[in-house]
Amino acid sequence: MANLIALPLLVILSVFQTAIVNRLPLLHGTADLILLTLAAWSLHERVTSVWFWVLLGGVLVSYASATPFFAPLIGYVVMTVIARLLRRRVWQTPILAMILITFLGTFIQHGLYMGALFIRGVTFNWRESLNLITLPSLLLNILLAIPVYAVISTLAEWVYPGELEI
Amino acid sequence: MNRLNSRSLRLAVLVIFIVGLLLLALGGYLTPLFRLTLNPIITVEAWLSSRYLAIHDMITVPKDVARLQQRNAELESQVTQLQAQVIELQQRISEAQVLYALLDFARSRPDNQYVAASVIGRDTNPFISYILIDQGSDAGLRHGMPVVTNQGLVGRIDAVTAGGARVQLVTDSASVVNVRLQSTQVEASMTASVTGELALQMVPTSASLSVGDVILTSGLGGSYPANIFIGQISSVRKRESDLSQTAIVQSVVDFVGLKAVLVITNFKPVDLNPLIPTPAK
């Protein structure tokens, strides 16, 4: 069930991301809906089908983007590993965990993007990139983290219903 | 005989009385009398009529209110539909204006063949500047084809699928465009920063650069056709100790609000990679 809904949901989110979200930048930074969705999904305690979602999200983003294939995928995988580790430790405060994962995920993803540019031989100003791209993206991601978490949590509870206590 | 006379007399008196009354009425002599007698009647009738209408309204108005509310809802629905139509038509006008501008541009350069495409998305990675367009190899688009608007150079095709393509903008940090200044014919390479700022790099200090100089593609390198408008120099960075100077270029294309583009399909980019010598191992 979880894997079945992953494809349409992540495809719709990818389309929404490229068609709308990327056209609404703050300075030069943009929010990453796929990252937020995967973070929220990974943090949910009952969710077991995580890696398929991560793989699919990474492939979809890589397919539409000119970024080297490995960068988004590795970023999502690393973020998910941290989210799963964090889930076991601070699961009582999922909102805090979501914000922390969003913070780390954004930096990891942008670090990989910058690494990919560096490998391609593109010279760029680190401070300018941080101030004009990464920090605005982080702010947008943190602003969207709570609503995305709420929606994805509802979805996760629908997909993985809890056991009734009699 | 007496009875007959008596009847005739009564009739005559009656006629005279009626005629007299009529004459008095027509002459206006009975108006005060009429007023005195009719006013109470009119007052009573008015009171009765107003009470009747109040009762009638009390009974019938709820039906009217319901009907009016229904009608109001219908009209509001119509207004909403019309507003939606107005917005749609305004959007079509906006699209049509863009397409007319592109058409004018295409007509002004009849030697080129164009395919018009709409911009449908932007790259997820904020460090690079790519757009997605809704025409692909089915429309004859190939890798490397230049992309322009009526304002100037946009970029070139980076990847193609059957129904779509990805365009590397000239504002992408990995993009290099060989350009020349229209006024002095000085040639240079134009690159971009990760934030999309265009700059002419490594221009010899002997070359004269000034604010407002028009930048065109030079055609060198075979990546872009020559003489496509790019923008103007907005500032020059030149220091005495430097071996070269740098100029910031203000592009004429609004890359943020890009809606439609033209792909030049009869230009075949030259791949210089085989000609570039590789270091011997």
What residue ranges belong to the model's regions?
Chain A
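Terminal, non-globular segments
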Residues: 1-166
